[in-house]
A protein has these predicted regions:
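N-terminal core-binding DNA-recognition domain of tyrosine site-specific recombinases/integrases
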Residues: 3-4, 8-80, 216-221, 236-239
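Short, charged hinge/linker segments at domain and secondary-structure junctions
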Residues: 45-49, 80-103, 290
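Basic, Lys/Arg- and aromatic-enriched nucleic-acid-binding interface segment
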Residues: 69, 88-91, 95-142, 146, ...
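Active-site/catalytic core of tyrosine-dependent DNA strand-transfer enzymes
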Residues: 78, 187-236
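Proline-centered turn/helix-capping motifs that create local helix->coil transitions or kinks
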Residues: 83-93, 156-159, 199-204, 300
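C-terminal catalytic core of tyrosine-transesterase DNA break-rejoin enzymes
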Residues: 84, 130-133, 137, 143-144, ...
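Catalytic-site neighborhood detector that most strongly recognizes the C-terminal catalytic loop/helix
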Residues: 110, 164, 265-290
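C-terminal secondary-structure termini that scaffold catalytic or DNA-interacting sites
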Residues: 170, 174-181, 188-190, 291-300
């Protein structure tokens, strides 16, 4: 049996065991980086050298360590499936080792409050301007922001209990984790912007998406408007997810308790918030240096 035929059955096996949003990402990555490479191979004829050649091919793509690790786990899972389902004899599997770790420098970017105010002036369109205000001032994940409906707004509080897959068919689904279900507070100014946007719709239903009305916004269109605004404001572009980083960094730099930030972001553990966001807290670093310089050490 060739690799591609076996992969179709494997994908059905995986699909029945995971959420739609997770599977759509898995399907994309597995198809792009594994099936496309092995599609002409027969699963019975795979050798350790074939797998090593694939690892070299992937290594040459200069992906991150974490992404390489994901791809390795995907391929290993497929091989184990073939071993059980089709009795393929892969005695070499114990020698199929993970990718070697490379030294990585974190590529993290975000907008400061001053930069965001400059960025937001680049919008003429009320819908997309309000969307990015929401992203920056709530820290919601992009899929969560796109999924917000009018019924989710109650005064200064917004209920986050669903998400939209950014890479698939834009279907509504449950949030990333149980902790992602949350209620977050919004400022009066953001509430006013949201109300103005909702009032602009010709006919309004509580089941309308706040951003888009009958249908949610498309990620490609959001990015197109973002790039236009960046060009107009003469500021570098950051990813949609980095607006979430921007919000977290804004809170950290204003000395908001890490537990409150973690809950607001929908993290299941405070350690996740610390690992992901504290490296960008430059103001805290400045305070640390100032404190150290002010300390008089008694050496004797």
């Amino acid at each position: 049996m060739n690799f591609k035929e076996a992969s179709i059955l494997y994908m059905e096996y995986v699909k029945n065991r995971h959420k739609k949003q997770w599977f759509s990402v898995f399907d994309y990555n597995f198809s792009k980086n594994i099936i496309s490479y092995f599609e002409t191979f027969n699963i019975e004829d795979l050798s350790l050298n074939d797998l090593k050649d694939w690892k070299k091919f992937i290594s040459d793509q200069d992906f991150s360590n974490s992404y390489n690790s994901q791809l390795y786990s995907m391929l290993l899972g497929f091989l184990e499936f073939c071993s059980k389902k089709y009795n393929c004899c892969y005695e070499f599997l114990p020698d199929f080792l993970p990718f070697d770790k490379r030294i990585e420098y974190k590529k993290t970017d975000f907008y400061t409050l001053k930069e965001f105010k400059r960025f937001i002036k680049g919008f003429d369109n009320q819908l997309y301007k309000t969307f990015f205000e929401f992203m920056f001032y709530t820290g919601c994940r992009p899929g969560e922001a796109m999924a917000i409906k009018i019924r989710d707004i109650n005064g200064n509080f917004i209920t986050v209990n669903k998400t939209i897959d950014e890479h698939g068919k834009r279907e509504l689904g449950t949030p990333k984790t149980y902790s992602s279900n949350r209620t977050i507070y919004i400022s009066n100014s953001l509430k006013k912007s949201l109300n103005n946007l909702i009032s602009s719709y010709d006919c309004m239903s509580l089941d309308y998406f706040v951003f888009g009305g009958v249908k949610p916004l498309a990620p490609t269109t959001i990015n197109r408007y973002k790039l236009k605004a960046c060009e107009k404001a003469n500021i570098r572009s950051i990813t949609l997810h980095q607006f979430r980083h921007s919000h977290a960094t804004l809170l950290l730099n204003n000395d908001i308790d890490i537990h409150i930030i973690s809950n607001r972001l929908g993290h299941s553990r405070v350690s996740t918030t610390l690992d992901v966001y504290t490296h960008s807290n430059f103001n805290q670093e400045k305070r640390l240096i100032k404190s150290l310089n002010s300390i008089k050490f008694n050496l004797f």
